[in-house]
């Protein structure tokens, strides 16, 4: 895309609005290098990343990123084996740690899938092994004492020498206060000295390191600490040498990973940029438009991003594929230029993968290039008039624009004789229309109103003007040509009625009729716009309610799953405890050679007491299951409490069954035995299930005519049924239409773990209107 349009539409100023949300140097670099794209798949991926991040944040909170600086020069020097400073090692550490934190955040994220972001995350290299090597630095870039054993010993010696020197110096300071100019110990040439009055220099034996500017004070190192200071300086030299050695070894260990560190830095920067887009999206009530190749520009509540949010006026702009040209007529200062810039700028932002200031449902066609003649671009150096300057620009546009270009003209034909200017404007627009070039033009020439009415694929538009307040509203009115309000405005400003009346007589009857017709059109348009706004308001409220309900539903599901898991664990603990106690009781029984009847009854009661007393009488699921057990007289059962087979004799009044086990007859509750199914029952049940599943599942599902949510639910159910029926291949008919249902189907198939592969149907079987899937 040509650079001139980026300057005209102030593209870089909009990019600056994202800069404050970025925390990494790499993210800022990616923003600076950003230009509009024309590859639909690449742009869609950028939008999908933001959509993924939005879902991730809604479920798991905002990802926090620390500030990082540019590693380009640091890594270049690392690869050249040049020495690095402690602060530079810390910068490397920050990037590595940030990569680890990001990976951990995504790994621990719940209730959301981020397939688009995963493409970036999968490229992140795990460098956690290097973090331990870099933990020897504090945040300022200084080495900790335990960076090496040698460094620890050296610094311990330094502290010992410093302490000893400080003690001696403090004693000398106290003893020689009268000889000192100040009651302090100071530093000269890295050695501790005393500020001695010049006349008392012979009272303190030592080495003079400095003199005050006045010559009244000498800075003397007492002989008592000279030797210790020498030792201290030697240890400091050893400390520097050890630090250099540690730096060198660490650099050698990091060098093989320089490529991975550099790649991680850029990947982190990209995630930072995605995060910045999300923050812009939410802070500005922006949206991610649908991308099209059908020449649709549909913008709902479009706003110019460089106008104050409190002042900007939102406009619906429907420049669909049925239209080739929009002609905005009417007086100046009504917002025509801003409308042109808004369309161009939002298109460029969308093609850059950035959110746009428009409501959901907006659609943007991808253009190869955008051209504009907006504002007074005359060149003083070339001594061109305003008209010549514009015409020079227009000539270049006509030479370069094609059917996949968007052209914007502001005050087309201005700067010359009105009749000739209008004629030129019509001819230029007609040339572009015949070449199928999408064009928006503003003009104040009334002749272009007739062109907009009489010409196919061309529509008039105007900017609304509030007569009562005598000021423009900046609302775009599609289908309504602009009209002059000069007479009415003059009347309200106090111009004598006689003058207004005489002026009105100068206007032809046909022109007067046209103005009345336009006025009625404006009223109807206002009514339609107001009705449309109310409908959109209700839609937004419904969408908000749907989001809230979905969030509550997901929360309930999470809490339910948590409670089920908790109950399951508790049940397992109860069973485990009961099992251990039962084993202990059985062991005690086995230890006794002979048992008396009352001991057997007591032991059995003890076993029964291990089971928790839960009332299942109101449980519908258990009732249904019990009814399906088919308990009847003569049925074979397995008595679980005795581990023996038996036969049901009769059902007693208390709900228990009399069961015969060999020669023993006893009464048991239904929970104490299980019905043993005969081979015939098992075979009949299997046939039943097989017949029930396979008889109802077809190999084709037709989603045409369904709403998105309805189609999505129908597809989920159908795949489950197809899997139960052991189908190998299925066909989903979704039609071509807008492509929304088709994209939903393919995303579902891509994510489903039981789908082996999928592709569009052959041409003779529906082509891109149907998808064939192979089941695993």
Curated annotation (Swiss-Prot):
SMART domains per the UniProt record, alphabetical: MUTSac (SM00534), MUTSd (SM00533), SMR (SM00463)
GO molecular function: ATP binding; ATP hydrolysis activity; ATP-dependent DNA damage sensor activity; endonuclease activity; mismatched DNA binding; ribosomal large subunit binding; rRNA binding
InterPro entries assigned to the protein according to its UniProt record, in alphabetical order: DNA_mismatch_repair_MutS_C, DNA_mismatch_repair_MutS_core, DNA_mismatch_repair_MutS_sf, MSSS, MutS, MutS2, P-loop_NTPase, Smr_dom
Lineage: Bacteria, Bacillati, Bacillota, Bacilli, Lactobacillales
Gene: mutS2
Annotated protein name in UniProt: Endonuclease MutS2
GO biological process, one term: mismatch repair
Protein source organism: Lactococcus lactis subsp. cremoris (strain MG1363)
Annotated EC: 3.1.-.-, 3.6.4.-
Subunit architecture: Homodimer. Binds to stalled ribosomes, contacting rRNA.
Coiled-coil region: none
